[in-house]
A protein has these predicted regions:
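Helical hinge/lid and interdomain linker segments adjacent to catalytic or ligand-binding clefts
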Residues: 1-39, 44, 79-83, 115
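A generic secondary-structure signal for well-formed alpha-helical elements
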Residues: 22, 46-50, 152
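Solvent-exposed, flexible loop/coil residues
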Residues: 10, 60, 146
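Acidic side chains
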Residues: 27-28, 119, 147
Length: 155
């Protein structure tokens, strides 16, 4: 996500989609460079003065839509996990802490969810490739994924 660049037309289409009830989940972008690049792009769609980015704290309902999520897990890509001997932070100290953030509309409806410094979707994509990766990451990855998707569909 850190390399996303929206055209003027995409900015207008995405803003209209989100303002009409749409939901966007952004996952798998790591470190401050990718975060800053993403913030720059999403700010063209949803100006931060009107739509600030906020941390989703553990009292937010998204943490318990279907499953109780204690905290956002840090899930690496399977290739990084293998190369690094089981490390989870793909940018080392620059991405040591995963973040669960969101952007809400003026009524408090969550429009954008961002899972930064983690790759939740890799927990679903790679389950058949390595049994240990599956055991380490898929249960929590599926729990987060289902909570986010169900929250987006029901709010």
């Amino acid at each position: 996500m850190g390399t996303a660049e929206f055209s003027d037309a995409e900015v207008e289409i995405l803003r209209a989609y989100l303002e009409k009830g749409g939901f966007l989940w952004v996952d798998d972008f790591w470190g401050p460079y990718a975060w800053d690049a993403w913030v720059e792009q999403i700010s063209t769609v949803l100006p931060p003065g009107e739509y600030p980015i906020r941390d989703l704290t553990q009292d937010h309902p998204i943490y318990r839509t279907l499953f109780e999520i204690g905290e956002l897990p840090q899930i690496p890509s399977i290739s990084f996990w293998r190369r690094s001997g089981g490390q989870t932070s793909e940018r080392r100290e620059l991405s040591a802490e995963p973040h669960f953030r969101g952007i809400s509309d003026e009524h408090g409806r969550l429009m954008v969810v961002m899972t930064h410094n983690t790759d939740i979707s890799d927990a679903w994509e790679r389950e058949g490739e390595d049994p240990q990766f599956f055991l380490n990451f898929s249960p929590n990855g599926y729990a987060v994924g289902l909570d986010v998707v169900l929250y987006g569909m029901t709010h």
